[in-house]
Swiss-Prot record:
It comes from Mesorhizobium japonicum (strain LMG 29417 / CECT 9101 / MAFF 303099) (Mesorhizobium loti (strain MAFF 303099)). Pfam families: tRNA-synt_1b. Catalyzes the attachment of tryptophan to tRNA(Trp). A motif ('KMSKS' region) lies at residues 217-221. Coiled coil: none annotated. It catalyses: tRNA(Trp) + L-tryptophan + ATP = L-tryptophyl-tRNA(Trp) + AMP + diphosphate + H(+). Belongs to the class-I aminoacyl-tRNA synthetase family. This is Tryptophan--tRNA ligase.
Length: 355
C-alpha cells in the first residue's frame, strides 16, 4: 500500500457548456469523492489552449465551470477549487516532465492522433505535450487517485510512467535527501518521491452518448443542441430533449444483454441508472418489457428532479462574479502553497540552484 496521504485530483477544461455527460461522468463523481477524501478540483484553462489558442471568453468559461462545480455540491472550503493558470508551478513541472517523457510515448497517445487528424504537422506542440501537463497537474499535488473517463485512461497510464521514470532516474538523490516514500509497485516495494496514481473509473453511466446518435459520445461541439442536455437547461428543455431522444421501436429488454446492438436504448437506460444511482440491471427490472412511451416520461421526470436545481443554482452563482472569483483566488492561494512545497523538493532532487 502507498504511504502517501490519499488525495484526489481532477480537472475540467473551460471549453463550452457542461452537459449531462460531464455531470454523470465526472462532476457527480467529484461530489461523491469529497465525502471520503481530500480533493483538489481544477479548471484546467491552460489545457484549453492546446487545440485553440485564441479564445473570446476564456475567463467567463472558467467562471462557468466553477459555478457548475459549486452548484453541483462541491465544497470550496473543505476542498480546493481553482483555475490552473493561477499556479505557475503547473507549467514548471510540465517542462520537467517534458524532459522525462519520451517522444515515443507521446506518439502513441490516441487522443493526439484523433485531435490532430491527418494534419499532424500543423497540430500544436502543446497538443502533443498535453499528457505531460496533465501529469504535472496530478503529480504537483502528489495525488494518489484521479477520477477519469475511458478517454483519459491512456493519459493516466502515461502519468504513472512519468512518475516511475522520475523515481527511478533520481532514486539515489531521493534516498540521499530522505524525501522518498515507500510504496508497492506491482509485486515490488520501491522508494519514490511521486506516487503511482490510481484511476477511479466506473459507475453505471461513466460514458454518456448523444441523444441523437447512440454511437457517438455526448459532446458540447455537436451542432445539434438536441444531442445533449446542458447543465444550464431548464426543466422544460430537459423534458423536451428526452422526449425527442432517438430510440428504436422495440420494448425495453428485461436483461442487460438485451441492450446489445441497441445503442440508443442502452444510452437512455445508462442515463437513468446514473441519475438514480442504480445498476442498468435494476433499471431493467423496473422497466423491462415496457415501451419507450412509458420509459421516456419516467426518465424525463428523474432528469428534471436531479438536474433542474443545479441549473437554477448555476444561474444564481454565475450572477455573483465576485464570489466565483473569490473562490478561485482562495483556492489558487491554497493550491500554490502545496505546489511550491512539491517544487522546492523537485528542484533539490534535480539539482537546480535555489535561494
Amino acid at each position: 500500500m502507498s504511504a502517501f496521504k490519499p488525495l484526489v485530483f481532477s480537472g475540467v477544461q473551460p471549453t463550452g457548456n457542461l452537459h449531462l455527460g460531464n455531470y454523470l461522468g465526472a462532476i457527480k463523481k467529484f461530489v461523491a469523492l469529497q465525502e471520503t477524501s481530500d480533493c483538489i478540483y481544477c479548471v484546467v484553462d491552460l489545457h484549453s489552449l492546446t487545440a485553440q489558442l485564441v479564445h473570446e471568453d476564456l475567463a467567463d468559461q472558467t467562471r462557468s465551470i466553477t459555478a457548475a462545480f459549486l452548484a453541483s455540491g462541491i465544497d470550496p472550503k473543505k476542498h480546493i477549487v481553482f483555475n490552473q493558470s493561477r499556479v505557475m508551478q503547473h507549467a514548471e513541472l510540465a517542462w520537467i516532465f517534458n524532459c522525462v517523457a519520451r517522444i515515443g510515448w507521446m506518439n502513441k497517445m490516441t487522443q493526439f492522433k484523433d485531435k490532430a487528424g491527418k494534419d499532424r504537422e500543423n497540430a500544436s506542440l502543446g497538443l502533443l505535450a498535453y499528457p505531460s501537463l496533465m501529469a504535472a497537474d496530478i503529480l504537483l499535488y502528489r495525488a494518489t487517485h484521479v477520477p477519469v473517463g475511458e478517454d483519459q485512461k491512456q493519459h493516466l497510464e502515461l502519468t504513472r510512467d512519468i512518475a516511475q521514470k522520475f523515481n527511478n532516474d533520481f532514486s539515489d538523490r531521493i534516498a540521499r535527501l530522505g524525501v522518498g516514500v515507500e510504496m508497492q509497485v506491482g509485486e515490488e516495494t520501491v522508494n519514490g518521491f511521486f506516487p503511482i496514481t490510481e484511476p477511479v473509473i466506473g459507475g453505471p453511466a461513466a460514458r454518456i452518448m448523444s441523444l441523437r446518435d447512440g454511437s457517438k459520445k455526448m459532446s458540447k461541439s455537436d451542432p445539434s443542441d438536441l444531442s445533449r442536455i446542458n447543465l444550464t437547461d431548464d426543466a422544460d428543455t430537459i423534458s423536451k430533449k428526452i422526449r425527442k431522444a432517438k430510440t428504436d421501436p422495440e420494448a425495453l429488454p428485461s436483461e442487460v444483454s438485451g441492450l446489445e446492438s441497441r445503442p440508443e436504448a442502452e444510452n437512455l437506460v445508462g442515463i437513468y441508472a446514473g441519475l438514480a444511482e442504480m445498476s442498468k440491471a435494476d433499471v431493467l427490472k423496473e422497466f423491462g418489457g415496457q415501451q419507450f412511451s412509458v420509459f421516456k416520461p419516467a426518465l424525463a421526470d428523474l432528469a428534471v428532479e436531479k438536474l433542474a436545481p443545479i441549473a437554477g443554482e448555476m444561474r444564481r452563482i454565475e450572477g455573483d462574479r465576485a464570489y466565483v472569483d473569490a473562490v478561485l483566488r482562495d483556492g489558487g492561494e491554497r493550491a500554490g502553497v502545496l505546489a511550491e512545497t512539491t517544487m522546492k523538493t523537485v528542484r533539490d532532487i534535480i539539482g537546480l540552484l535555489q535561494g
